[in-house]
Amino acid sequence: MTNMMRALVKTRPEVGLWMERVPVPEVGPNDVLIRVRKSAICGTDVHIWNWDQWAQKTIPVPMVVGHEFMGEIVEVGPAVTKHHVGERVSGEGHIVCGKCRNCRAGRGHLCRNTLGVGVNRPGSFAEFVCLPEYNVVSIPDDVPDEIAAIFDPFGNAVHTALSFDLVGEDVLVTGAGPIGIMGALVAKRCGARKVVITDINPVRLDLARKVGIDYVVDASKENLADVMRVIGMTEGFDVGLEMSGAAPAFRDMIDKMNNGGKIAILGIAPAGFEIDWNKVIFKMLNLKGIYGREMFETWYKMIAFVQGGLDLSQIITHRIGIDEFGDGFEAMRSGNSGKVVMDW
């Protein structure tokens, strides 16, 4: 194997990414080297491409980016015991310290010292990516490559959706991006009574209808209260999944929650915004922030969902070769796509 590889790199502090030749990562004693088969583009990668304020404060240059992937192990460190060469794998993109209070208590997703693959350390938009053995997840034979490549965002959806009991509950999802749609699918799969998803993007609303979400609402044209009456809801929503990061959507969700309702919040707002805290207090709402995936319960759950028949294939709207990465990023930046998966 050559000691150089192709990778998408943030080589300079401006808009874009560039295909470069960079060294193959060195494998430490507890590390696994993975030959990447498929990569998917995340909203985080779009922020890095756009070189927005968050990216400028966060990303060291140069940096190999990307963190949604699947591949095959080609080398293991001498201390690795649970994985082997030739194994199909994906990986948890949050590298935790293992030493802080939360890590030692089994709450790694709450680690204060988390490093992000493709953010703080070299990522998976490359022919090879290196991860600690602890972060590597085996992919069963009955899970397709392209589905394993989107397990990172699917995990965000699963973590958000499973934050609260969904059985027999009425669920509102604000934001019909890929993660929002996947969250709605999980809610349906778990036995929610009515699942309503809202957005203002017609392309994403059409995708939500295509995958089988029962109640799809264009918030720019329809009043959510009217929709609730039409579908027979006499009280508010029991569970809210906030996936949009949009102030109007979040305010509408708070307004439409039942007393004692529970809201899991994954969407990141571009700037701070006001909400009516009196409604939160007097409705006795429970708000929970979500970041990433629970390690590794979320991974077990999402593998089980896929093996149990949950079809995510329609969430992938663009399948391209890695040399077409520019087209993939344009699709993601337009907001008129589902997931974009790139083949190495």
Swiss-Prot record:
Which residues participate in Zn(2+) 1 binding?
A: C42, H67, E68
What superkingdom does the record give?
A: Bacteria
**Family annotation (SUPFAM superfamilies):** GroES-like (SSF50129), NAD(P)-binding Rossmann-fold domains (SSF51735)
| EC number(s) stated in the UniProt entry for this protein | 1.1.1.103
- What cellular-component terms does GO give this entry? cytoplasm
Q: GO biological process: what's one of them?
A: L-threonine catabolic process to glycine
Which sites are catalytic? T44 (charge relay system), H47 (charge relay system)
Mind telling me which residues the site (Important for catalytic activity for the proton relay mechanism but does not participate directly in the coordination of zinc atom) is annotated on?
D152
Q: What's its top-level EC category? A: oxidoreductase
Pathway assigned to this chain's UniProt record: Amino-acid degradation; L-threonine degradation via oxydo-reductase pathway; glycine from L-threonine: step 1/2
Family affiliation: Belongs to the zinc-containing alcohol dehydrogenase family.
Q: How does it assemble?
A: Homotetramer.
Q: What is this protein called?
A: L-threonine 3-dehydrogenase
Source species of the chain:
Sinorhizobium medicae (strain WSM419)
